[in-house]
Amino acid sequence: MREVTVRKGEPIDRALKRLKTKLDVEGILDEMRRRRAFETPMDERRRKARSASKRNKVKWRYSNKSEETASETAETPASAPEA
């Protein structure tokens, strides 16, 4: 169970926000919302496929940037000594 200690002079709203961000980062709120109602196997497959496509888009975006910088450095000729 996650807990947040309320600091001296800290408003309750701030402590609740810290708790919510902790739970959100760990994915506990999403898990709780998902388990609130029964999910059919087909719905589960759809949800997983959607999240996988989102992950792949992000991976593709970042992998392209690293490939572009690698190809740019490979395309520039090395300074060779002229004879």
From Swiss-Prot:
Which Pfam families does the annotation name?
Ribosomal_S21 (PF01165)
Q: Which GO terms describe its molecular function?
A: structural constituent of ribosome
Q: Does the keyword Ribosomal protein apply?
A: yes
Supply the alphabetized keyword list. Ribonucleoprotein, Ribosomal protein
**Which superkingdom heads the taxonomic lineage of this protein's source?**
Bacteria
UniProt feature, compositional bias: Low complexity: 71-83
The alphabetized list of GO BP terms reads:
translation
Protein name stated in the entry: Small ribosomal subunit protein bS21
Which species is listed as the source? Akkermansia muciniphila (strain ATCC BAA-835 / DSM 22959 / JCM 33894 / BCRC 81048 / CCUG 64013 / CIP 107961 / Muc)
Phylogenetic placement of the source organism: Bacteria, Pseudomonadati, Verrucomicrobiota, Verrucomicrobiia, Verrucomicrobiales
